[in-house]
Amino acid sequence: MKITAVIVAGGKGTRMGADKNKVFLKIFGREVLYYTISAFEKNDKIDDIIVVTGKNDIEECQILVDKYDIKKVSYITEGGATRQESVMNGLKKAEGDVVLIHDGARALVTDDEINNSVADCIKFGAAAVGVKCKDTLKSADSDGFIAGTVDREKTFMIQTPQVFYLDKILDMHKKALD
């Protein structure tokens, strides 16, 4: 079974006030994207990696891949106008059976998260990393006023990777874009 990681790294860093894509900011001397790609590079379940980034960042991505001698990156491809279009561009380059879609800025992904989400996808058809919500959640009425408290025991915050059978997620994206 071939497993591909699609790393979406097309952000501009605007919300955090950065003057460039946040995945190229350095932590402990290395780019955030280095740590993200490395997690998938080192994982023995991952066969190849596709990086999706902005047109102006493709060269910087290639420099990073070369600089750190990353072997599993098979494509660096241009993103789209939206995250969904960027994901679709990455999926179009993917081959094989299972695909993990992961945010390039989420550098702290663990082997267990990767391995468990792949295993759960194979078992259940799809999977995503999620963490129980610890904050107090409120629901609002149509006027925006608090209507009640949501039971946080039944809520999860979904993160990445999100894992799917490639043919299924491609079909869903095609339908969503039609």
Protein language model annotation of sequence segments:
Residues 99-100:
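Short aromatic/hydrophobic "clamp" motif used to bind/position activated sugar donors
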Residues 108-178:
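Conserved core of the sugar-phosphate nucleotidyltransferase
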Residues 3, 73-75, 155:
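Short, conserved active-site loop motifs that form the nucleotide-linked donor/cofactor pocket
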Residues 16, 61-65, 117:
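Hydrophobic packing residues within well-ordered alpha-helices of enzyme cores
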Residues 34-96:
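Conserved N-terminal catalytic core of the sugar/cofactor nucleotidyltransferase
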Residues 1-58:
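N-terminal glycine-rich phosphate-binding loop and ensuing alpha1 helix
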